Each structure stands twice: as C-alpha cells, then as structure tokens.
C-alpha cells in the first residue's frame, strides 16, 4: 500500500488575466521507504505540486480537483487546523533552495525549535537540546554554534542540512 498517492491533481491560481492551470492532472504514488524524484522544466509545476500536498499555496492558489491520499487520509479535504498538526509532524518537504525556506531574521535554533514546541509540547530549553541533536544527526560540525547562527551565516550545503533536520524534526 502506498504511503502517498496523488490522483489527477489539478491546482489552479486566480489571476487578473484569468485562471492559470499550474498543475493539470498529475498522478503518482510513493511507497513506504522509497524515494520519488520529480523532474521537469522550470515552471512545469513541480513546486506547486509539493505545495499542494502540504496545502501551502498562496492565497490565490487552490486545489480544483483530485485526491492527495496520505496515510489513508485525503489531505485535499483536511481542514487548515488539522493540516497544521500533520504538516511538519507526519509529512514534510525539503526545498531545493533552502535560503528561500529559512527565515533570515531568526536563528537556526529558533526555526528548528518550532516543530518540537508546537507538535511535541516541549519548552524552549528542551527544544534547544533537541535542535543540537538534530544538527548532529545531519552531520553539522559544531552544532551548538551553528544553532545560534542565522541562515545567511551558513553555506548553501549547511542550509540544506538544516532543512533536512527540519523535515526530520
């Protein structure tokens, strides 16, 4: 049984010039323990597909039709409140360019702490300890120091590792 199944997904955006069909009939599945690479030209809908799965579309974007079955639930029908519990806890995405996903005004620790505080009820001190553990898990050298840094102070590869740690959190 697939962990994630996308059936005939259609994601559209309302614009002043009309409707833009960003994702038009995409279907695929991912089995537990397997990896799926989504490849396509720039502007072909890869990122919009991922944003649709996580329900992170801009205000003018919407899922017009299709199903996003994750762990037996159709995420297309899940409320915003329930999706906040699922997103970052049960399902995550690691974006290609981490600098656009990390907030430049917050430290790595602050950003990585959020899932532990929100989803696991940890206090800030407990979450800070867990952040260092996560940074160690993705083989970031000197994780205590890196946790106190801002994204712009890290190399692209280090930012990517931070995003992997965030997805695993």
Task: Specify the residue positions occupied by each region the protein language model found.
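ABC transporter nucleotide-binding domains
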Residues: 1-169
């Amino acid at each position: 049984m697939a962990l994630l199944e996308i059936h005939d997904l259609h994601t559209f955006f309302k614009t002043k010039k009309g409707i833009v069909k960003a994702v038009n009939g995409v279907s695929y599945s991912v089995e537990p323990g397997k990896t799926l690479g989504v490849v396509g030209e720039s502007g072909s809908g890869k990122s919009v597909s991922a944003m649709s799965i996580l329900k992170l579309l801009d205000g003018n974007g919407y899922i017009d039709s299709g199903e996003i079955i994750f762990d037996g639930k159709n995420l297309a029908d899940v409320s915003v409140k329930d999706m906040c519990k699922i997103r970052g806890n049960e399902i995550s995405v690691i974006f290609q360019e981490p600098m656009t996903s990390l907030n430049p005004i917050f430290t790595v620790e602050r950003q990585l702490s959020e899932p532990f505080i929100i989803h696991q009820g940890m206090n800030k001190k407990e979450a800070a300890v867990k952040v260092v553990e996560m940074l160690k898990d993705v083989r970031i050298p000197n994780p205590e120091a890196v946790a106190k840094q801002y994204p712009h102070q890290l190399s692209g590869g280090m930012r990517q590792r931070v995003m992997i740690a965030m997805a695993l959190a």
